[in-house]
Amino acid sequence: MAISRGAKVRIKRPESYWFNEVGTVASIDTSGIRYPVVVRFEKVNYTGIDGTDGGVNTNNFSEAELELA
């Protein structure tokens, strides 16, 4: 799989908030960690603090959980 920084990818992890959404690869860690690919999304998830418009718009995935969009 030829995933590189800046590539558009679709998320295939069923339990992810961003399942089947498209995001942009922000970075790839080559040190051997379990989820080396950081993906950035346009929308935020539901983990914002009560009363604020915020949340997380990045998450780590393994290459097996991604497909090029």
From Swiss-Prot:
GO biological process: photosynthesis
Family to which the UniProt record says this protein belongs: Belongs to the PsaE family.
InterPro entries: Elect_transpt_acc-like_dom_sf, PSI_PsaE
Organism listed in the record: Parasynechococcus marenigrum (strain WH8102)
A Pfam family assignment: PSI_PsaE
Primary location class: membrane
Membrane disposition: Peripheral membrane protein
UniProt name for this protein: Photosystem I reaction center subunit IV
Cited function: Stabilizes the interaction between PsaC and the PSI core, assists the docking of the ferredoxin to PSI and interacts with ferredoxin-NADP oxidoreductase.
Keyword set, alphabetical order: Membrane, Photosynthesis, Photosystem I, Thylakoid
GO cellular component: photosystem I reaction center; plasma membrane-derived thylakoid membrane
HAMAP family (alphabetical): PSI_PsaE (MF_00613)
NCBIfam families: PRK02749.1 (NF002745)
Gene: psaE
Subcellular location(s) of the protein: Cellular thylakoid membrane
